[in-house]
Regions:
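Luminal/periplasmic acceptor-recognition loop/helix of membrane-associated glycosyltransferases
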Residues: 156-158
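RNase H-like, metal-dependent nuclease domains and their acidic two-metal-ion catalytic environment used
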Residues: 1-152, 161, 169, 173-177, ...
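Extracytoplasmic catalytic/substrate-binding loops of multi-pass membrane glycan-assembly enzymes
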Residues: 164
Length: 185
């Protein structure tokens, strides 16, 4: 049942079930969560635990929402070398404004690799990022090939790639499975 909502592309919050057991979530909350060093922005929804260290590599991973209603756009800044979350944002913001915010935070964190979900309204945010000329953006393969060789072959030729990360019924189980494997170790 825990994977059913995820595999059917359902909303975890409304399905009443999650991928991770509540005990695991509570353990991580009690063990690892700490107050941010800084809360930034008009809405104070940008939480920073570590400022950029210019000797480190970072990744900014973003999920785009419309900017109104009950859904929120969010991003996480990850130190790639230590696998540590150093900042996060969750807020109701327009898709274009979110693109500008992402470019700003990615530049602040050493021109971080910017990974934005490209489904539906994510395109508006991605277009803003591309219009700003941000260079270090993740591209997904256009095909459904699952092996690393096909990915790296295509990575050399952006005409075979699409900007952003494509979350789909094929990639979602892989992403969640890999994350579950990571946090359980």
């Amino acid at each position: 049942p825990r994977m059913a909502a995820q595999e059917c592309d359902c909303d975890f919050n409304t399905s009443g079930d999650t991928v991770f057991y509540n005990e695991y979530l509570e353990f991580y909350e009690q063990t690892y969560m700490k107050e941010p060093l800084e809360k930034r922005g008009v809405d104070k929804n940008l939480w920073v635990w570590e400022s950029a260290d210019y000797s480190r590599l970072y990744m900014v991973v973003a999920d785009v929402a419309r900017g109104d209603g009950k859904y929120y756009s969010a991003f996480h800044v990850i130190d790639i070398e230590s696998n540590t979350q150093v900042a996060e944002y969750k807020g109701q913001i327009g898709t274009k404004e979110f693109g500008h915010l992402l470019v700003g935070i990615a530049n602040e964190y050493n021109e971080a690799l910017l990974v934005v979900e490209n489904a539906n309204i994510g395109w508006s945010t991605i277009q803003t990022i591309l219009d700003r000329g941000y260079q270090n953006m993740y591209y997904s393969p256009k095909s459904d090939a699952l092996n690393a060789e096909s990915y790296f072959d295509k990575y050399q030729d952006k005409s075979k790639m699409v900007p952003g990360f494509t979350m789909s019924t094929r990639t979602r189980p892989m992403v969640i499975g890999k994350f579950a494997e990571y946090v359980s170790d």
